[in-house]
Amino acid sequence: MKKKTSLSEEDQALFRQLMTGTRKIKQDTIVHRPQRKKITEVAPKRLLQEQVDNSHYFSDEFQPLLNTEGSTKYVRPDVSHFELKKLRRGDYSPELFLDLHGLTQQQAKQELGALIAACRREHVFCACVMHGHGKHILKQQTPLWLAQHPHIMAFHQAPKEYGGDAALLILIEVEEWQPPELP
C-alpha cells in the first residue's frame, strides 16, 4: 500500500487557488480493452491436420525409382547433386531428430508427416530420421515414402555420428521467412 504524502496547509491552499475554475475530466473517449494472451502454442487440431496433410503423400503402392547400389540416397531432379554430397559428408547437422523404432508403418507415416510439418513451420532445413534395423520394414519403406513427398529435396544415409545405416539425413524445402506486414 502506498503512503499518502501530506501537504502543508499552505500548499493545499495554493493548490486550491490554482485549480479554481477548472472541472474534473470525464473519461469517456478511451476504452481500455483487456490484453489478449499471445498465441505461442500451435493448436492441437492444427498440428493433427498438418500431420495428416503431410502423411497424405506417403503411398505404399507407388514405388519411386531409387538407386539400390551403395548407400540409400535420393535427390529431387531440380536440386543440385552437390547437396547430396554435402549430406553424405556431414556438412549439414540436423536440428530435429525423429526416432521410428517400435512404430507401425501407419504410425511411422504420421510421424514423418509431423516431422516435415514441424520443419517447415520452424524453418528447419535438415533433420535426421532414425528408422533402425529391426526387420528392415521401416528401413526399406522410409526412403520410398520420403521420395514421394514434394517438400523433401534430398536424403542420404546418415554419417556414423547420426546413426549410420540405421538413419537418414533429410533436406527439407522450407518457405523463405517473410517479415510480417505492418498495417
From Swiss-Prot:
Keyword Cytoplasm set for record: no
The protein's role, per its UniProt record: Acts as a ribosome collision sensor. Detects stalled/collided disomes (pairs of ribosomes where the leading ribosome is stalled and a second ribosome has collided with it) and endonucleolytically cleaves mRNA at the 5' boundary of the stalled ribosome. Stalled/collided disomes form a new interface (primarily via the 30S subunits) that binds SmrB. Cleaved mRNA becomes available for tmRNA ligation, leading to ribosomal subunit dissociation and rescue of stalled ribosomes.
PROSITE patterns (UniProt xref): SMR (PS50828)
Molecular function terms, GO-annotated: RNA endonuclease activity; rRNA binding
Family affiliation: Belongs to the SmrB family.
First-level EC class: hydrolase
SUPFAM superfamilies on file: SMR domain-like (SSF160443)
Protein name: Ribosome rescue factor SmrB
Quaternary state and interactors: Associates with collided ribosomes, but not with correctly translating polysomes.
Keywords: Endonuclease, Hydrolase, Nuclease, RNA-binding, rRNA-binding
Domain Smr: 98-173
Gene Ontology BP annotations: rescue of stalled ribosome
Pfam families: Smr
EC numbers for this chain: 3.1.-.-
